[in-house]
A protein has these predicted regions:
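N-terminal targeting segments with Sec-dependent signals, encompassing both cleavable signal peptides
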Residues: 1-194, 198, 203-209, 216-219, ...
Length: 243
């Protein structure tokens, strides 16, 4: 399944006395001169992903007693597929607060899904009210459980690979194709789903065009199309018959 967005805690704070440029400069050179809100804010306005990662790491180190900074570090590790590190970091985040936090529960639910522990994931998602990505996570969980109609409901009007996949698995090929069409930044998985939609619609040109994009973005994923039954008749049609 396409990756879920992890739950970072971001703040839109009104910082007095410092411009955005000054905050960025200090976050790079002297992060300990910024307060926790300023340093967390720096990560949201960083010009590059590398800078954002640096600011998140600095905040978690300097303000380790603030569960928000530690949760953000864990979310960053989880996004980088560092599952063991993320698990340990979320434990530290939970230990840094006296109250259960929805964001930590949500991220731990993602860890549980990755570990195929759907029961634990469902329990934790039930304690994640208020997290913006909750519907998306519930949708993915229901896809893994085979509850495709419920997954469609969970995603609502979401425009994502996961939402398109739920529609596709529910037999709503046209709706799945429409969702993919409206994704602004398509990746290899987007085009793969689009290719399946085209195959189910009998659109050979669409299959070819979308799989070409898959190959351009992810050659390993493109290879899997060779054994995917969704495309069998289209691949076979390219083989010259024997006379």
């Amino acid at each position: 399944l396409p990756k879920l967005r992890r739950s970072h805690l971001t703040l839109t704070v009104k910082v007095t006395g410092k411009t955005d440029e000054e905050i960025i400069a200090l976050a790079k050179s002297n992060p300990d001169t910024l307060n926790v809100e300023e340093l967390m804010f720096a990560a949201t306005i960083a010009e590059t992903e590398e800078d954002a990662a640096q600011f998140i790491a600095s905040a978690a180190e300097i303000y380790a007693a603030d569960w928000r900074t530690v949760n953000n570090l864990g979310a960053q590790e989880l996004a980088g597929d560092k599952y063991a590190d993320a698990t340990a970091t979320f434990e530290k985040a939970a230990a840094a607060t006296e109250n259960e936090q929805a964001e930590i529960n949500f991220n731990n639910a993602l860890i549980s899904m990755i570990n195929s522990d759907n029961a634990k994931a469902e329990e934790l998602l039930g304690k994640s009210a208020g997290v913006a990505q909750l519907g998306e996570a519930q949708g993915v969980l229901n896809i893994t459980k085979g509850n495709y109609a419920q997954a469609v409901s969970d995603f609502g009007a979401s425009t994502s690979n996961n939402a398109a996949l739920a529609q596709l698995l529910s037999g709503n090929t046209d709706k799945a194709a429409s969702i993919i069409e409206n994704i602004a930044n398509k990746n290899a998985k987007s085009y793969y789903i689009a290719a399946i939609c085209a195959a189910r619609a009998g659109d050979a040109a669409g299959v070819t065009a979308n799989l070409a994009k898959v190959k351009e973005l992810d050659e390993e994923m493109a290879k899997s199309a060779l054994t995917d039954l969704e495309f069998a008749k289209f691949l076979a049609a390219e083989v010259a018959p024997v006379q």
